[in-house]
Regions:
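N-terminal localization/anchoring segments of enzymes in phospholipid and broader phosphate metabolism
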Residues: 1-271, 275, 279, 303, ...
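A general structural signal for well-ordered alpha-helical packing
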Residues: 270, 277, 298, 311, ...
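C-terminal structural cap/anchor segments
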Residues: 309, 313, 321-368
Length: 433
């Protein structure tokens, strides 16, 4: 692809507020993107890959707001839901029966009473600890409630559906504003809950996470993904014409919405990460709560470091899963040997799933860098092509680095024997994580 064109000479498809742009406008946008970001190969490879795999087109004129941690995210989502006039669609892995969960349940019930249709998808495994009465209250109020792939053996039709979980976190309000990222509807963001931890890194406060608020044409793509899941799970019929309408320009960011599902050709988020890291020229900065990928992904990361790209990876110093904590650490040796810089976040459980590459390409979403997210779960990520947003992401990344302990090769070689044993056995079972 050269000068904003694909291999057959046509520019990539770009969607604006009024629909698909002409070839000439798309070509102009690609030219401006290359000039502004200086990351032509990275952006072109990403768009070419998505077109080849049948992924969604790039959308123009979006406004993206970075939301840091639960309280800020909850406040922004609450404000948007409170102002809803037509509908609210919520898709979440966890919806806890705690102070935060009850706040949102009350808010959704209030909006339903105001004739705003509320549609909710919750994951059966993620909400296993939430009592059925919690969701019955929502149903009784008129909210359409859908349980994703029920664990109940009497309800599930195929065994493989037990491993296919809906790990997405998505809220769409009136088809105009969307929220996505790593934040579940849970009170863990105001208080800690951890099991495994590095020495001196015990949890002291709520979880550290990242979310985004997006307005603009890309919201239609978020809405479409929600509606697809709703149909697949046999939810009550919805008049989709009421959910996807005319979009307005809201900002200057270019956004691509990636929804991945199980299946060799449906792992769009995995392929997106591989492509972006392979085409990085300057730096790759990754933040994830679990790092348990396959060999190809690890090789892609280490190859980038060996060719001179600055690769930094922030992981939790405290975790909600001891097995996942040590399974992630079992990959440290290969990463450190290649020159990857590793950091473990102190004091707070790190739950963010983000990346910023070469100061131009960013992603925020629900996808962990592990086999569950890449192979078995329904996940959702926003790819943002905007240097201002990338600057904000980089600032947040550096703040997390400052609040982390760097893992050096010397320090890693001196870790206790018991840690090595835990890493060995955790790696054996990492395929189940």
């Amino acid at each position: 692809m050269e000068d904003g064109r694909t291999d057959d000479g046509t520019p990539p498809v770009i969607v604006g507020p009024r629909g698909e742009l002409s070839d000439s406008k798309s070509r102009d946008i690609m030219s401006r993107l290359k000039q502004k970001t200086g990351s032509a190969e990275l952006i072109q490879a990403n768009l070419s890959l998505m077109e080849t795999l049948g992924g969604p087109p790039l959308t123009a004129r979006n406004h993206v707001t970075l939301l840091v941690d639960g309280p800020e995210t909850f406040a922004s989502m609450s404000e948007a839901i409170s102002e809803a006039k037509e509908h609210v669609n919520v898709e979440t892995y966890i919806f806890d029966d705690d102070e935060v969960g009850r706040h949102f349940a009350d808010l959704l019930i209030r909006k339903q009473s105001e004739k705003v249709q509320v549609n909710l998808i919750y994951d059966s495994v993620g909400c296993m600890s939430t009592p059925p009465a919690f969701f019955k209250r929502l149903k009784d109020a008129g909210v359409h409630v859908l349980e994703f792939n029920p664990v109940n053996p009497l309800k599930v039709k195929k065994a493989q559906l037990l491993t296919n979980r809906d790990h997405r976190k998505l809220v769409v309000v009136d088809g105009k504003v969307a929220f996505t990222g790593g934040v579940n509807l849970s009170g863990v963001y105001s208080k800690g809950r951890s099991m495994g931890s590095a020495p001196g890194a015990e949890a002291q406060s709520g979880w550290r996470d990242t979310h985004v608020r997006i307005a603009g044409p890309s919201v239609a793509q978020f809405q479409q993904l929600f509606l697809e899941t709703w149909r697949d799970q046999k939810g009550p019929e919805l008049d989709e014409k009421k959910y996807i309408g005319e979009m307005k320009p809201e900002g200057r960011a270019y956004v691509e919405v990636i929804g991945s599902t199980p299946g060799a050709l449906n792992r769009l988020t995995y392929f997106m990460y591989i492509s972006a890291i392979k085409n990085a020229k300057s730096f790759v900065h990754l933040t994830t709560s679990y790092f348990i990928p396959d060999k190809q992904f690890v090789d892609t990361v280490t190859d980038a470091a060996r060719r001179g790209v600055e690769v930094k990876l922030i992981l939790p110093g405290v975790s909600d899963s001891k097995l996942a904590f040590y399974a992630s650490r079992s990959r440290y040796e290969d990463l450190l040997e290649s020159g990857v810089k590793l950091y473990e976040r102190r004091s707070r459980m790190l739950h963010a799933k983000t990346a910023v590459i070469d100061g131009a390409w960013s992603t925020v979403g629900s996808t962990n860098l592990d086999l569950l997210s890449f192979q078995y779960n329904n996940e959702i990520n926003a790819i943002i092509l905007d240097t201002d947003f990338a600057d904000a992401m980089e600032d947040l990344f550096n703040r997390d680095v400052a609040a982390s302990n760097e893992i050096t090769r010397d320090a890693w070689s001196q870790r206790p024997p018991w840690d090595r044993v835990m890493e060995f056995f955790s790696r054996i079972f990492s395929g189940t994580l």
